[in-house]
Amino acid sequence: MARRKAAPKRETLPDPLFHSELLAKFINAVMRNGKKSVAEKIVYGALDVVAKRVQNKSGEQGDGDGEGGGKAGGIKKRSLGDIRTDENARALALETFKGALDKVMPNVEVKSRRVGGSTYQVPVEIRMARRQALARRWLVEYANKRNEKTMVLRLAHEILDAVEGRGGAIKKREDVHRMAKANQAFAHYRW
């Protein structure tokens, strides 16, 4: 155990476009080598793709909502400016993102506990801040592992898959829950 005091919680400034602390933390999770503007472009671009895909699914079904077909219709013309100007698209993208994060958040995890010479995997409940942190981390990690061409598309498709209950991040959550369920016999070792 650490002998120092717990680190003080730092206040996170909300992101400039959506005014959401949750999204600001997600941008920080996407950020590499301190390049925040690049991370913002990736996240906002992904949310733009998510908003368009959700609008296409709910609204105009006839235009074709798959990514095939090249430059179909007006999708390529107004690629990034859409969520920056359209309030409805912005709200839709944020709701979809929050839904994806909620579906990826784990409830329990296993922690190693050494008792009498043997190590047990003890299931413990996770506090909310860690749930969100794990969900953000898994979304970014499994978006990186996808095969789409750009990180914008990878992240957008991972978010959409998470909302629909599939994808790598959801699989990771199910694996963590399965491990906790399998080791439920050791729950009385909880501390």
Curated annotation (Swiss-Prot):
Gene3D superfamilies the record matches: Ribosomal protein S7 domain (1.10.455.10)
PANTHER family: RIBOSOMAL PROTEIN S7
Family to which this protein belongs: Belongs to the universal ribosomal protein uS7 family.
Annotated source species: Coxiella burnetii (strain CbuG_Q212)
Sequence segments annotated as region (Disordered): 56-80
Known function: One of the primary rRNA binding proteins, it binds directly to 16S rRNA where it nucleates assembly of the head domain of the 30S subunit. Is located at the subunit interface close to the decoding center, probably blocks exit of the E-site tRNA.
Cellular component, GO annotation: small ribosomal subunit
Subunit structure: Part of the 30S ribosomal subunit. Contacts proteins S9 and S11.
Keyword Disulfide bond in annotation: no
Record bears the keyword Acyltransferase: no
Matching PROSITE patterns: RIBOSOMAL_S7
Residues that span the membrane, as ranges: none
Record-level Gene Ontology MF annotations: rRNA binding; structural constituent of ribosome; tRNA binding
Protein name according to UniProt: Small ribosomal subunit protein uS7
Pfam families hit by this protein: Ribosomal_S7 (PF00177)
Biological process according to GO: translation
Alphabetically ordered keywords of this record: Ribonucleoprotein, Ribosomal protein, RNA-binding, rRNA-binding, tRNA-binding
